[in-house]
Design a protein with these regions (language model features):
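N-terminal ligand-binding/catalytic initiation module
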Residues: 1-153, 375, 381
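Solvent-exposed alpha-helices and their adjacent loops that cap or buttress functional pockets
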Residues: 12, 55-60, 96-97, 122-124, ...
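Glycine-rich phosphate/diphosphate-binding loop of Rossmann-like nucleotide-binding domains
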Residues: 74, 81-99, 157, 165-262
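General beta-strand structural signal in soluble alpha/beta enzymes
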Residues: 105, 131-134, 155-158, 189, ...
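Adenosine-phosphate binding glycine-rich loop
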Residues: 158, 282-382
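Rossmann-like adenosine-cofactor binding region
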Residues: 232-302, 307-309
């Protein structure tokens, strides 16, 4: 049985990966009178007087919504809300298993920006946070920014920021392995969608200043055509040298490659043209931009991918459960840039210097320390 066949079989057996489990048990008339009418009126009256009391008396304190419109699901593309459900259920499982956070999958049958924003605002009272998932760019940028302005609970687009945080964590440790310095490193980010933009922003915030973004058309610059509004903002702060040309041109003399793009688009010749001891994070799934063995043969020192069957998996599951755990426990109203930086540094710190090597720059999601270390990093900044 192939993995694909096994996955389909298990999903059929599970018939959904989630269920509701009651914390209050109704076995007697007294139980019923306390959990429901008439007793339930008491917390209702308290909350009506003080909305903050909902965190004390309801599931709001440890429950988030995982919201998607199904427009950019994994490598499957715009498959719609129903087909996106297995992914959102899976995401909810990861929140619970790794962070102890309750998560409810909500797949919306609209891809209209205004309708999505209005719907999330209207359902927000039931939740302590909103995790946006698999919403296509550039709509995802506006949806997140508007919701952050409108709501007093944390809103987090994991495809952007979870990915960026783990990439930065990996790069922090890869710099130690290679002896490179962020101030002088030349970085190429290939893929100018949600993840690529967020990665670039966080690397800039951390202190990288020589970053070039590329997409299918090549190097992005101020004179590039057909840029969306977010990409136009990004070319104002990247490619300061005014480079033009292809991905190969961008990689010539670069120190770090971060790929969130397409399979097999980086060649050995491109890697060989990079600076000595290059760092490559080739995260296209399931087939990376270049296979690790080929990158190593061409001279790369540290190679990470999105896959669990290669060393240095760059997996945002080490970030998002702990981020929301900390945000909920600390009653954060926003997840700030400072929190993202602190989270990346915390994840990087899980691999001590004496254990760092070219094949060990990131801790695994199954490391029991991860969620607590990440959540503490978030709470310290609330």
């Amino acid at each position: 049985m192939t993995n694909q066949e096994k996955a389909l079989k298990m999903h059929e057996e599970w018939n959904g990966k989630l269920e509701t489990i009651a914390k209050s048990h109704v076995k007697t008339r007294e139980d019923l009178a306390i959990a429901y009418t008439p007793g339930v009126a008491e917390p209702c009256k308290v909350i009506a007087e003080d909305k903050e009391a909902a965190y004390k008396y309801t599931i709001k304190s440890n429950t988030i919504a995982v919201v998607s419109d199904g427009s950019a699901v994994l490598g499957l593309g715009n498959i719609g809300p129903l087909a996106a459900m297995p992914v959102m259920e899976g995401k909810a499982v990861l929140f619970k298993e790794f962070g102890g956070v309750n998560a409810v999958p909500i797949c919306l049958d609209t891809q209209d920006t205004e309708e999505i924003i209005k719907t999330v605002v209207n359902i927000a009272p039931a939740f302590g946070g909103i995790n946006l998932e698999d919403i296509s760019a550039p709509r995802c940028f506006e949806i997140e920014e508007r919701l952050k302005e409108l709501l007093d609970i944390p809103v987090f687009h994991d495809d952007q920021h979870g990915t960026a945080i783990v990439v930065l964590a990996g790069i922090i440790n890869a710099l130690k392995v290679t002896g490179k310095d962020k101030e002088t490193c030349k970085v190429v980010v290939n893929g100018a969608g949600s993840a690529g933009v967020a990665i670039t922003k966080l690397l800039l915030t951390y202190g990288f200043s020589h970053i070039t973004m590329c997409d299918i058309s090549g190097i992005l610059g101020k004179d590039s055509q057909n840029l969306n509004w977010m990409q136009k903002k990004m070319v104002e702060v990247t490619n300061l040298e005014g480079k033009k040309g292809t991905l190969a041109d961008a990689l010539n003399g670069a120190d770090i490659f971060v790929g969130v793009s397409a399979p097999n688009i980086v060649t050995k010749e491109m890697v060989a043209s990079m600076n000595k001891d290059a760092i490559l994070f080739a995260m296209a799934n399931p087939v990376p931009e270049i296979m690790p063995d080929l990158a190593k043969e061409a001279g790369a020192k540290v190679v990470g991918t999105g896959r669990s069957d290669f060393p240095n998996q760059v997996n945002n599951v080490v970030a998002f459960p702990g981020i929301f755990k900390g945000a909920l426990e600390g009653r954060a109203t926003k997840i700030t840039e400072e929190m993202k930086l602190a989270t990346a540094k915390a994840i990087a710190s899980l691999v001590p210097d004496e254990e760092l090597n070219e094949n060990n720059i990131l801790s695994e999601a199954f490391d029991p320390r991860v969620a607590d270390v990440v959540s503490e990093a978030v709470k310290e900044l609330i």
